[in-house]
Structure formats: C-alpha cells, structure tokens
C-alpha cells in the first residue's frame, strides 16, 4: 500500500481533471444527540464501507488518491476524511476501516490535544484524540492532516492567527508524528483566497474544503458530506452526481 506521505507529482501544465470523490465524515458513535448531524453510527459506517467495496471501490487517504491520480491511476479509489480528530475514531472507525481494507485521512487539531469540541455551542462534549492517539492512528496506516490548531474560521483570522493555524499546526504535527504533513482541512469548510495562500505558503500539498465556490485547485478540493441518513441509494446518487455538479479541478489529472 502506498505511503500516506506521498505527494502528487507536479501537474500545473495539465488540463483540469475530473473532480476526485472525497467523502467527509466527523464522529462515529451515538447519534441520539447530534444537532449538527456530524455523527454516523458504527453500523451505518460499516454499511457504507460495504457499499464501496461491493462497487469495486476502495477508501484511501487523500494523499494516496492524489498520488494515484498523478500517475494516471486510481479510478477505483475514493478518499475518506474524518474531521476534528474525535477520540471515537480509534475504537469505532479504525476497526471498520481495517476490516474493509480501507484507510483514511484524519484531520486533527494539535492545539486541542485531549480536549473536546468546545467550538460547538450545542450537543454533547466529545473528547478529541491525544497525542498518543494520533500516533496510534498514524501507525495503523492513516494519513494525519491538519485541521488548524484550534478550529477557527480562517476567513476571519488576522495575519498572526492565520499563520499559527496553518504553518504552526503543521510544524507541531510533524514533530508529533515524525512524518511529513501534506494535507490541510479548512475548519467549517469556509475558505477564501487569503486562506488558500496561507495554506499554500505553509507548505501543504493539498487542502480540503466543502464547497469552494469559484475557487479551484489542489488547495480547495471539494468534498461530499456523508451522514447517518446516507443509505446505499443516497450514496449512489451522491457518487454519480458529484462529478456532474462539480467543475474539473485545475492542477489534477
């Protein structure tokens, strides 16, 4: 299996390629108190992974998907991402990913190690991964990416905070994991040209958004929200409609 630290080969002279399918998850666990609809149950996640595999698809990290695309491969790959770095990833998501032969990118908050989702005013307090938990996920083959230091809206950050959330978070994670950190994920999915430039200057090879609007390129990759209500039929529709609704991404094959 390719290393999750692979970076896609330079593609700036290529014509835009089809938009990659990148699934966005958050927490895996109890959905009974979930005001933001960010949690999927372990049973639902397993059904979704089973659906992927039965369609001949395999979930991988974003870095692995982009590296495969740069080689002209990866038609059978989709990227799986888990935002915020919830502690339930180790006990609930990781065993299922392993069972179904998948990997994923885990976007974590090195400024909140062992903390909780204090940025959410509603819903239960959910514990976040500790430094040891992040290292365990990396050792299991997951790509570790940055979600910023503390989960702030980068479009509202001043210059000093913007640099801390992008460049400093990357440095902290690289020291923590001992491996290069090439991926970033914009908190709340909010992004503008200034945030993109800060992420690029911080040395990230790619960054994930949700709906980047008119922005395009490897530092504003769109993603598909996956939730508890996404049955096989809904997954099929999301998979098919994604490429129809999204413009090709500049800089990708």
For the regions a protein language model found, what residue spans apply to each?
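Acidic (Asp/Glu)-rich catalytic clusters
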Residues: 15-17, 53, 95-101, 127-146, ...
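Alpha-helical scaffolding within the catalytic cores
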Residues: 6-10, 90-92, 120-139
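Generic enzyme active-site microenvironment
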Residues: 81-82, 145
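Histidine-centered catalytic micro-motifs
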Residues: 23, 27, 143-151
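A short, conserved beta-to-alpha structural element at the edge of catalytic cores
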Residues: 101-123
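A short, flexible beta-alpha/helix-coil linker loop
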Residues: 28-31, 111-112, 150-153
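C-terminal active-site subregion of NodB/CE4 polysaccharide deacetylases
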Residues: 2-81, 87-90, 156-253
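Surface-exposed cleft-lining segments at the edges of enzyme active sites
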Residues: 115-125, 151-159
């Amino acid at each position: 299996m390719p290393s999750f630290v692979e970076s896609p080969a330079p593609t700036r002279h290529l014509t835009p390629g089809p938009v990659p399918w990148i699934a966005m998850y958050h927490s895996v666990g109890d959905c009974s108190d979930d005001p933001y609809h960010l949690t999927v149950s372990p049973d639902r996640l397993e059904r979704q992974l089973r659906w992927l595999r039965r369609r001949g698809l395999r979930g991988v990290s974003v870095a692995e998907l982009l590296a495969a695309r740069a080689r002209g491969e990866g038609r059978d790959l989709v990227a799986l991402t888990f935002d915020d770095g919830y502690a339930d990833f180790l006990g609930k998501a990781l065993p299922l990913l392993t069972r179904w032969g998948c990997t994923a990118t885990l976007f974590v908050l090195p400024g909140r190690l062992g903390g909780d989702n204090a940025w959410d005013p509603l819903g239960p307090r959910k514990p976040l991964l500790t430094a040891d938990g992040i290292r365990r996920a990396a050792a299991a083959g997951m790509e570790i990416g940055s979600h910023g230091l503390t989960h702030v809206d980068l479009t509202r950050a001043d210059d000093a905070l913007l640099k801390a959330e992008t460049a400093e978070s990357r440095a902290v994670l690289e020291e923590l994991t001992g491996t290069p950190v090439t991926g970033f994920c914009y908190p709340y999915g909010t992004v503008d040209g200034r945030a993109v430039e800060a992420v690029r200057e911080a040395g990230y090879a790619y960054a994930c958004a949700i709906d980047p609007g008119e922005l395009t390129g490897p530092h504003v990759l769109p993603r598909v929200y996956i939730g508890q209500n996404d049955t096989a039929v809904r997954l099929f529709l999301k998979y098919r409609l994604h490429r129809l609704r999204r413009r090709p991404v500049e800089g990708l094959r």
